[in-house]
């Protein structure tokens, strides 16, 4: 599994200021760390490779048990995914680093569906609104060929990938905005993001 992560200062720009009093880079790191925590706990994932040039992300990834690959292309998400997937010999997948409510069981279900249903083609999972993509898989011998970005669900379909269809709300709920974060909170955030959300809430008066 390839997990690309931007430098924290440049990541998740639409979330800037979403949690009053919480530094933006801390929130971006928490989203990635909780995503990575769930991916590493998924029994269907044999290896996790984080592609990043951010020192804090790299340290957190190594501490969690993932491999780290420098983002040598330094040319955006798709280039980072291609770079990370380049040496794969078997099944390979890429996931966005902004699904902090992710449950390992849901990721397992999606990966098994990709492998067991139409296993010779690339598969992708749209995000909750249905326009973006949170997960892309490729079978042995097929390039991952990522098309992440605005309208990526249509772009992946146009490239020949087939959509996955399953009940995986925590996997599909990526977080780009404060409203997305609130919805992920209702699903149940991972520990690092949950702690920051709690810290960013206004204190309730005793009266």
Descriptions of predicted regions:
Residues 28-45:
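A short, N-terminal amphipathic alpha-helix
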Residues 96-100:
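The conserved acidic donor/metal-binding loop of glycosyltransferases
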Residues 102-186, 207:
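Conserved core of the sugar-phosphate nucleotidyltransferase
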Residues 60-93, 152-155:
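Short phosphate-binding loop-to-helix
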Residues 191-207:
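Charge-dense polyanion-binding interfaces
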Residues 15-23:
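Short glycine-enriched, charge-decorated loop/helix-capping segments at active-site entrances
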